């Protein structure tokens, strides 16, 4: 499971394109890590995952987060032979911390997710709220 900072949760809840970009960044970072750990290159290794984007917490509070299940290894896809599976050992605490930091840095580079971008997004939403009148 990957939780996100509160400000980013609000942004992603209201911007499906940004949510898609962030999910892609997370997937690619983990897949690349697995492929590298297997000693393969992206051209010769492939992994897979299933992701559930959960939008609410148990108290029905807004809580965008990802539940991701990755293969515990990589398929070697080189040549005409059938793909061969290579198991990758579970990451240690330091390795996991480095991967989380890498994901955080990359998510911060996604357009719309930096602090100034989030501030502009809040201003835009506030403007929409001010100009929207209840029907009736």
Describe every region a protein language model picked out.
Residues 1-136:
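Beta->alpha loop/short-helix hinge microenvironment recognizer with preference
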